[in-house]
Curated annotation (Swiss-Prot):
Record protein name field: D-galactonate dehydratase family member Mmwyl1_0037
Gene3D superfamilies, A to Z: Enolase-like C-terminal domain (3.20.20.120), Enolase-like, N-terminal domain (3.30.390.10)
Keywords per UniProt: Lyase, Magnesium, Metal-binding
Top-level EC class as recorded in UniProt: lyase
Length: 403
């Protein structure tokens, strides 16, 4: 069996999504997610110009060998564009391999470690009261865990908060990057009130998560983690940038609030120190940006040695193809923690028919051979690419800051 063809499909049924489709000479095909939010065309070019020509004629069942070929052979290793492209190939090949075996992907990985996968949803609001209403909607749907974000008085835009009530949060929404304003002081003074309100309204049984989105310095993050210990958060996510992984030592020394990070990581090297020194509790890497199933399995296996659990990124900047693959991985991986979930648009679900199902706060991946997600190319063609870039942040004095 050999790879006969491969092509990239770009569609925008709500936001830009990139899919790689690989077909064998026996007619079996697999698909992988190649979406890199705000940089989609960079991955398209990398795949079409540098990856696809090298795949033709290769044995699709040699998944590890092809992964090594694309990683080691490129010389310019790692980086979000290259690793997203490799991930797309890798997931498509695992999809093919599972289809050839006639089994769902989780079975090929080693079988079930659990019957269902706990997910957390996103509740946002322009203020605390409106955020509580969104939390209530999630609880009524059966969610056991909810990420909470709300507007901060005095800041016109806040990460994770929709511009309009009831609308999904989509940060990449303009032809050029929008400029947002940020105040660490206002944020730190306000956000504990949100957690207090959620606990008062919903009690201790609901898991509360929160994303700081790299906005704090280590000492500021330590202060926040210490102040919110009494609210028993499931985790505090991305509280500071970690180009210097050892910065988490300071945070860890000052708080017992569980820490999660990693959605921007694309290799074990990005998080090795964080994991082996037990500076985090959850690794947030994603299959699509961390080199696919082959590579994220290495990260998860390493993390398990140090009692670090998975908590994979799963927002709508990734397609249902990634969600399907992630749910199969989550069903297998022994050190599973939780899976992020944001519902895609109805149009997206039509483009990507899938076998996974939600019920009472949990997902099951389905039992069809492969990862259980397909793409309807005719419907995809109805939604052409639209330029959209992620915002940038400035402090109130005009200094550029982490978005």
């Amino acid at each position: 069996m050999k790879i006969r063809s491969a092509k990239v499909i770009v569609t925008c049924p709500g936001r830009n999504l990139v899919t790689l489709k690989i077909e064998t000479d026996e007619g079996v095909y697999g698909i992988g997610d190649a979406t890199l939010n705000g940089r989609e065309k960079s991955v398209v070019s990398y795949l079409e110009d540098h990856v696809i020509p090298t795949l033709i004629g290769k044995d699709p069942q040699r998944v590890e060998d092809i992964w090594q070929y694309l990683y080691r052979g490129a010389y310019w290793r790692r980086g979000p564009v290259g690793m997203t492209a490799i991930a797309a190939v890798d997931v498509a090949l695992w999809d093919i391999k599972a289809k050839l075996a006639g089994m769902p992907l989780y079975q090929l990985l080693g079988g079930k470690s659990r019957e269902k996968v706990m997910v957390y949803g996103h509740a946002t609001g322009l203020d605390i009261e409106s955020c509580l209403e969104e939390v209530r909607k999630h609880v009524e749907l059966g969610y056991k865990a909810v990420r909470v974000q709300c507007g901060i008085p005095g800041i016109p835009t806040t990460y994770g908060v929709s511009k309009e009530a009831g609308k999904p949060y989509e940060p990449a929404d303009s032809a050029l990057p929008a400029e947002h304003v940020w105040s660490t002081e206002k944020y730190l003074n306000n956000v504990p009130e949100l957690f207090a309100a959620v606990r008062k309204e919903f009690g201790e049984d609901l898991h509360i998560l929160h994303d700081v989105h790299h906005r704090l310095t280590p000492i500021q993050a330590a202060r926040l983690g210490k102040e919110v210990e009494k609210f028993h958060l499931f985790w505090l996510e991305d509280c500071t940038a970690v180009e210097n992984q050892s910065s988490y030592e300071l945070i860890r020394k000052h708080t017992t609030t569980p820490l999660a990070i990693g959605e921007v990581f694309n290799s074990l090297s990005d998080c090795q120190e964080l994991i082996q020194n037990q500076l985090i509790d959850y690794i947030r890497a994603t299959i699509t940006h961390a080199g696919g199933i082959t590579n994220i399995r290495r990260i998860a296996d390493f993390a398990s040695v140090f009692h670090v659990k998975t908590g994979f990124h799963g927002a709508t900047d990734l397609s249902p193809v990634c969600m399907g693959a992630a749910l199969h991985f989550d069903t297998w991986v022994p050190n599973f923690g939780i899976q992020e979930h944001m519902p895609h648009t109805k149009e997206t679900d039509l483009v990507f028919p899938h076998a996974y199902e939600f019920n009472d706060g949990f997902f099951t991946p389905g039992d069809v051979p492969g990862h259980g997600v397909d793409i309807d190319e005719e419907i995809a063609a109805k939604y052409p690419y639209k330029p959209a870039y992620l915002p940038v942040n400035r402090l109130e004095d005009g200094t550029l800051w982490n978005w």
